[in-house]
Amino acid sequence: MDMGNQHPSISRLQEIQREVKSIEQQVVGFSGLSDDKNYKRLERILTKQLFEIDSVDTEGKGDIQQARKRAAQDTERLLKELEQNANHPHRIEIKNIFQEAQALVKEKTVPFYSGSNCVTSEFEEAIQDIILRLTHVKTGGKISLRKARYHTLTKICAVQEIIEDCVRKQPSLPLSEDVHPSVAKINSVMCEVNKARGTLIALLMGVDSSETCRHLSCVLSGLMADLDALDVCGRTEIRNYRREVVEDINKLLKYLDLEEEADNTHAFDLGQNHSIIKIENVLKRMREMKNELLQAQSPPELYLRSKTELQGLIGQLDEVSLEKNPCIREARRRAVIEVQTLITYLDLKEALEKRKLFPCEETPPHKAVWNVLGNLSEIQGEVLSFGGNRTDKNYIRLEELLTKQLLTLDAVDPLGEEKCKAARKQAVKLAQNILSYLDMKSDEWEY
């Protein structure tokens, strides 16, 4: 239809659809809960558009009625997705774990408010356990769940960094106040810094509604000014003491700056952690090798060289410092599985090539197991290349293919032959490992 002659009702429906389309990505990526301001804003916009669509006069014309129906369906689909994102069982699981962390923080930060810098091992271990549980929440590759898990993890990891710093680096002093008049003031400031540390942790976890980032930042800047004004000339030990307290203040200010930017940036970016960077460098090299190996038709001369380098990558991952951080532990675990899966793929390819070159007499059951192993090798190559989520047709197809191979193995009767029994057991384990790897791939890890 010529745009100049288009019916006004059709034009209005198209305009509404453009408005709905403009917020679609916000809905798809919505990672909050149904009581969030942003949820209510998106819900209000979409509901308003539904009313607007409903008010369009179709004049009884079939084409306008169809256009109105399509526009309403698109809008209702987004409303439904918004509701599902906010109420997804795994989103609720993330919320419940975060609430546990909030309760823990409320209980364990009390000593900070008296000026103490004491962090119990119980608090430290409980935070680590919460982070570990969050890393195991399945997202199925769903954007909203990945964002929710990431945002929650970064908050709690920031708290963990703060309390780890307390454990790792207590100020080497305080000095006795008899040493110098400035020491009493530094001791007083250090007490205030410890109180601010507790307040910051409470702020990060959303359990202190009486404080704001801006006010706490002003308090810390004031303490910094007090320290700068002290005369500590010629007293190295006092100057060092002051420097340690200044460093503590700067660290807390850094967290405050990140928290204020949190809505617009990747605050507390785990990707900047030096251990994560090492893991990512290993994965980058592994992916380069994987692409080369999967593209090659039949490169047996490449297998040995590649396996040697891949074993070296496993060694590099073994050397990564975990820093008592479950996020790093999970990232390393997944990286080891990635590299080990590629090694297993090469081992199977080698075994299949060797069987072709040096055929030997096999019983029918043993031959059936080898046929399944050949199928598994082909499927594993596809799984290694997979990059989607569980709702993808390719995921479902690969899962069905692997299940079929397991059923085929289950039907093989070894007829009491030990060698065939062992081969079947190994093939079953391989198929299960590939299924597990496919599941992991559908839930890509984010930093």
From Swiss-Prot:
Keywords: Chaperone, Repeat
Keyword Lipid biosynthesis: no
UniProt-recorded Gene Ontology molecular function terms: adenyl-nucleotide exchange factor activity; protein kinase binding; protein-folding chaperone binding; ubiquitin ligase inhibitor activity; ubiquitin protein ligase binding
InterPro entries: BAG_chaperone_regulator (IPR039773), BAG_dom_sf (IPR036533), BAG_domain (IPR003103)
Superkingdom to which the source organism belongs: Eukaryota
Gene Ontology cellular component terms for the protein in this record: cytoplasm; cytosol; inclusion body; junctional membrane complex; membrane; mitochondrion; nucleus; perinuclear region of cytoplasm
SUPFAM superfamilies to which the protein is assigned, alphabetical: BAG domain
Tissue: Detected in brain, lung, stomach, liver, kidney and testis.
Single biological process term from Gene Ontology: negative regulation of neuron projection development
Domain BAG: 9-86, 95-167, 182-260, 275-350, 365-442
Oligomer status and interactors: Binds to the ATPase domain of HSP/HSP70 chaperones. Binds PRKN. Interacts with HSPA8 and JPH2.
Primary role: Co-chaperone for HSP/HSP70 proteins. It functions as a nucleotide-exchange factor promoting the release of ADP from HSP70, thereby activating HSP70-mediated protein refolding. Has an essential role in maintaining proteostasis at junctional membrane complexes (JMC), where it may function as a scaffold between the HSPA8 chaperone and JMC proteins enabling correct, HSPA8-dependent JMC protein folding. Inhibits both auto-ubiquitination of PRKN and ubiquitination of target proteins by PRKN.
Protein name per the record: BAG family molecular chaperone regulator 5
Gene designation per UniProt: Bag5
